[in-house]
Amino acid sequence: MTASITEIDSISEESNVESVSHLQHSPSFEKKGADFSISLNEKKDFASPITEEIPSPDGIATPEPETKKKLSFGARVWDLICSPGRQHDVCVAAPTQLVRSCDDYANSASTLVTNDDGTKTKVDSDEKKHKHKNVRDYIRFKHVDIGGRIFDLITRLAGTSFTFILMLIILIVWAIVGGIYRAPDNWQIVMQDGSSIQCYVSDTLLMRQQQNQHIQVLTMISQLRSRLLTTSRLLGPVLNDKTKISSVNVALMKDDVGDAEKLPTENWFDFICNYVSFMVGSIIFLVVYWIGIFIWIGFGRMLGWSDEWQLYINTAVAVELTFTSVFLQNVRHRHMKYIDRCVTSIFRIDSVIEEELRRMMGDKEPNEEITIKMDKINLGERSIDYYADLIGSGVGVVVSTCVFVAWIAIGNVMHWDSNWWLIIGTYTGLVGFLDGFVLRNVYFRESSKEATEIQTLIDEDYALYQKLDLPLPHEHITNYKSTFGGSLSQWIGWLCALPISVLFSVFVILGLIIAAGSLRFNETAQLFCNTPTMIIEGALLIVLIEAHNIANLKRRIQFRQIHLRRLTILKMLAGDNYSTTSTV
């Protein structure tokens, strides 16, 4: 089932493309009367059929004609309840260059000139100017509803360097206050509650960030494959006609996206973050973390296994959770910026290649739409996706707000004592424990899907080079080498990502609640709930950072090599006229 959501206006070649709205449930996107369309086709349940979109003569996608029964009110309510977590196929056609434009422009000699206003100008033999605007960038998604856009804005802000530095300042101030007042219990409880609430919110933002970046990467891949099909179709005949190649006059693009293995550092903060990301996500850091836990257990008998003993580890882990959760958001944000920069450069190169090939061949056939089919999932994975979708949506925000309001409301009844302070930490700690496993499971499956689709794109790249009998360039420059620590971290990550691991976390939570209930949820019971869940959640975040580092490093290298292969094709087309002095 698909439904038209919004329209996109054409923009100039040097500006960013207007973002295409992305609605999580059954969205579809078209550009009316234009060359491209983006849609997310909904897969209901596990393998239900979807309504295909077929292009009409005027370029507007229209549903396949079929008789459709109107759902009853009860059926619509049930459909709404079941909608979170549904899988969607991604259908994208890259913006076609010079399709349906004037014949004089398409057949004239190539003089790619970019004016200040971003409009390309060509002059034919009659000195008559023709202007045309082409979409150079790739099409981006954004939510169509105002609530979704605000949520996405908050998610982006949470990943910025400003937010990360602000959190570091708060931790430093808290540590100074504790030193002045000699670390009283209330000081420790404040950190535990604050950390639990912050991690609870961060889990929501991390899930939202993960979902948005996943659909964005699949959209990038689909559009790259769409344009590659056109390039492959037109490039062979052009290369066979050497007389046409000499007419290409393009001085465009230099290799300026930076090293994929060592991210480009814009300032000292980026340099430090790259190093810290490597250290925090390493197997060494994870081993040190667990050594610290066992040392704490060793002091248990000396301290009489008291509440104070539990407070110590809870406070230490709370600091680690706050740091790693905010740091993970920042790492993802910075890594995605590099990929966006690299893919933007690839798209601009691709658009120039496509435009030149179409001019030479007089071709106006639109770029083909590429559909990425979502994998079939089982009942357990569907349940996990349902919960994850609720976390990363407005529903999760509403539930969180209600819980915090209820907690504040009972404060006066409980006389604002230590037990009241611990209640919110217990709730957010238990939920955060489950969220950690859910995040890992969803990330593992989404990352695997992205890796599969990127490899499909690479295989099609290789097929083009083989078809043209060209050597693959630059493959020796950057190749990911797995280490023992990296392999061990990946294995631990895989183990934590299993659906059975998520189910295990649910049983652990139920067991802790039953045990705490037998103690009437007193201070000792709540600390007992917090301690093991916080320890495991802290370890899961370390594993998640390492998993992201490994997967993102591979992805950056792959996009980087795609960029270099596109530059090779552009240089081959331009011949001696190619220059690397211009910027992207």
UniProtKB/Swiss-Prot annotation:
Q: What induces the gene encoding this protein?
A: By zinc deficiency.
**Membrane-spanning regions, if any?**
161-181, 278-298, 311-331, 390-410, 419-439, 494-514, 527-547
**In which compartments does the protein localize?**
Golgi apparatus membrane; Cell membrane
Query: Quick one: where's region Disordered?
Result: 1-28
- Domain of life here? Eukaryota
Q: Say if the entry is tagged with keyword NADP.
A: no
The GO molecular function terms of this record are: iron ion transmembrane transporter activity
Chief subcellular location equals Golgi
Q: Which GO terms describe its cellular component?
A: cell division site; cell tip; Golgi apparatus; Golgi membrane; plasma membrane
Stretches assigned to the Cytoplasmic side:
182-277, 332-389, 440-493, 548-584
Sugar attachment sites? 522
What keywords would UniProt list here? Cell membrane, Glycoprotein, Golgi apparatus, Ion transport, Iron, Iron transport, Membrane, Transmembrane, Transmembrane helix, Transport, Zinc, Zinc transport
A Pfam family of this chain: Iron_permease
Q: Name one GO biological process term.
A: zinc ion import across plasma membrane
Classify the protein's membrane topology as the record does. Multi-pass membrane protein
Q: Which InterPro entries match?
A: Iron_permease_Fet4 (IPR007251)
Which residues are on the Extracellular side of the membrane? 1-160, 299-310, 411-418, 515-526
- So what does this one do? Required for Fe(2+) ion low affinity uptake. Has a role in zinc uptake under conditions of zinc limitation.
What is the similarity comment for this entry?
Belongs to the FET4 family.
Protein name, as recorded:
Low-affinity iron/zinc ion transport protein fet4
User: From which source organism is this entry?
Assistant: Schizosaccharomyces pombe (strain 972 / ATCC 24843)
